[in-house]
Regions:
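Mature secreted bioactive peptide module from preproproteins
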Residues: 36-156
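N-terminal prepro-regions of secreted/extracellular proteins
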Residues: 1-55
């Protein structure tokens, strides 16, 4: 590979260096069963989750990762079970690759609510003049309150 000039190095850094992290919630249905779940009128199961987009300094998406869970119980009273239905990651950005799950998904009761964690591995395989992030493990940690509210963060 030919040596890069300073301007090219600056562009490459901006294109491949992680910047802002965007969090998107899964769309929530507005049907009657979801309303019943929200009002705590009956035991019910529903899906929830989040999708995270890791942006580069330049604004392009480096990679995405997600978590989808099923929440069962009577919100406001008791969450009986939470299980991970789907999790994973993907990238189509040059120099980045998705390496799979970092560990098995975990979900367990905490007090009156639940906690769920999934983790994914990404790698930036090319290093040019010191540019490259190496391997990154990213996580989605979610808490589910007795009300049924799902809150996700990127903390590992």
């Amino acid at each position: 590979m030919a040596e890069l000039d300073n301007h090219q190095k600056s562009l490459l850094r901006a294109y491949t260096t992680p910047g802002e992290l965007i969090v998107k919630r899964l769309p929530q249905p507005s049907n009657l069963s979801t309303k019943l779940f929200a009002q705590g009128e009956a035991d019910y199961c529903r899906k929830d989750g989040a999708r995270f987009e890791q942006k580069a300094v330049m604004g392009n998406t480096l990679y995405t990762y997600w978590q989808t869970v099923e929440i069962c119980g009577t919100p406001g009273k008791k969450i009986k079970n939470v299980k991970v239905l789907d999790h994973g990651g993907e990238t189509s950005t040059p120099t980045w690759s998705y390496r799979g799950s970092a560990s098995n998904p975990a979900s367990y009761a905490v007090g009156a609510g639940w906690f769920v964690r999934t983790s994914e591995n990404f790698e930036q395989s090319i290093v040019v003049d010191g540019i490259g992030a190496g391997q990154r493990t990213v996580c989605i940690s979610a808490t589910i309150r007795p009300s049924g509210e799902y809150n996700a963060s990127e903390r590992c």
